[in-house]
């Protein structure tokens, strides 16, 4: 269980679900009565896209209305997040996203078109999991220590990919750089799938990205996994060490995926979405599908508890970005 999962699980145990208590006795609104849109800020093939399609399918089954996933990739997830922030707060437009557009980009990018804290309403987390550090299969480095040595000897010649500025892969690599005192060139893509394709084609040296995005290429031999970013080895890759084991003590980095509504969305609608997601996350079908992607269920917190977590994450990343001098390059 990673830091995110522990935090959310503890919050869920310590507090009764606030949103439910707020609306006890209230009448559930006639919602939805038409198609609901779920926006994703990254292309198909990303881990967040898998989570979105799974959640959308289950919501559609429960609600009896179409729930469609729209991929609006670009700007590190900001395009989709901005569209949701500016959408009518009627419950028919939601965002399923990874952390970047919510807790990172505001501290990294100038002239953000939306305020993630004021303009977006946290509803619930869905899943979380570790990342994999992988390299193209012909890179001379066979382990993390050799990769660090190669990066120092290459003097800015190695490049790493991400799914966009401020994305989880971007921040994971920047943290790696900071903790190992190496320099590498950042190559941002619209999504991790494009970067993985370039690694397989030997045009990109390395990525630190989600297990759903990389496992196919790792298993197929197109890329080589050097480490996982969790504190414990992952059962899907038992022979791959953690970055702690590989010589970077204290390195831990995971990704979470969560749902957000526009600010000022009715508490009744927020509660309905929250309860629907909690129900689906308890089913064996959903748990099995998430486990098959090597991610964990992470949806125990109420909207208020999850909102508190988001604010803390935002403050922590602002400090990391400032301390490390990370730039939007």
Predicted regions and their residues:
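Hinge/capping helix and adjacent helix->loop/strand transition within the periplasmic-binding protein
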Residues: 86-92, 99, 107-194, 243, ...
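Short beta-strand/turn micro-motifs at beta-sheet edges
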Residues: 26-28, 119-123, 244-250
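A ligand-binding cleft/hinge motif common to bilobed small-molecule-binding domains
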Residues: 101-111, 170, 175-179, 206-240
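Short, low-complexity disordered leader/linker segments with a strong preference
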Residues: 1-33, 145, 329
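An extracytoplasmic/periplasmic, membrane-proximal ligand-sensing/linker region
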Residues: 33-35, 180-182, 245, 267-329
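N-terminal (or domain-start) structured segment
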Residues: 25-118, 157-159, 181-208, 300, ...
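C-terminal lobe and pocket-closing loops
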Residues: 214-283, 312-315, 320
């Amino acid at each position: 269980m990673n830091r995110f999962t522990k935090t959310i699980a503890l919050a869920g145990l310590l507090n009764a679900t606030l949103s439910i208590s707020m609306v006890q006795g209230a009448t559930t609104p006639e919602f939805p009565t038409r198609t609901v849109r779920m926006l994703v800020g990254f292309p198909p093939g990303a881990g967040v896209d898998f989570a979105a399609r799974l959640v959308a399918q289950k919501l559609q089954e429960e609600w009896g209305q179409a729930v469609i996933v729209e991929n609006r990739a670009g700007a590190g997830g900001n395009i989709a997040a901005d569209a949701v922030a500016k959408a009518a707060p009627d419950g028919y437009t939601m965002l399923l996203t990874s952390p970047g557009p919510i807790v990172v980009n505001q501290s990294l990018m100038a002239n953000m078109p939306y305020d993630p804290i004021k303009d977006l309403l946290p509803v619930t987390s869905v899943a979380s999991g570790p990342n994999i550090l992988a390299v193209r299969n012909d890179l001379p480095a066979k382990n993390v220590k050799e990769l660090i040595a190669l990066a120092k000897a290459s003097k800015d010649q190695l490049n790493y990919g991400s799914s966009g500025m401020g994305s989880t892969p971007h921040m994971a690599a920047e943290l790696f750089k900071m903790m190992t005192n190496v320099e590498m060139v950042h190559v941002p893509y619209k999504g991790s799938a494009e970067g993985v394709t370039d690694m397989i084609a030997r045009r990109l040296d390395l990525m630190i990205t989600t297990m759903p995005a990389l496992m196919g290429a790792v298993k197929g031999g197109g890329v080589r996994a050097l480490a996982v970013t969790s504190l414990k080895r992952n059962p899907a890759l038992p022979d791959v060490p953690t970055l702690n084991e590989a010589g970077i003590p204290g390195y831990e980095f995971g990704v979470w995926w969560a749902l957000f509504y526009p600010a000022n969305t009715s508490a009744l609608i927020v509660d309905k979405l929250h309860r629907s997601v909690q129900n689906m996350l308890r089913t064996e079908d959903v748990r099995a599908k998430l486990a098959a992607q090597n991610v964990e269920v992470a949806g125990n917190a109420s909207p208020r508890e999850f909102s508190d977590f988001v604010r803390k994450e935002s403050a922590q990343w602002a400090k990391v970005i400032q301390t490390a001098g990370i730039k939007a390059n």
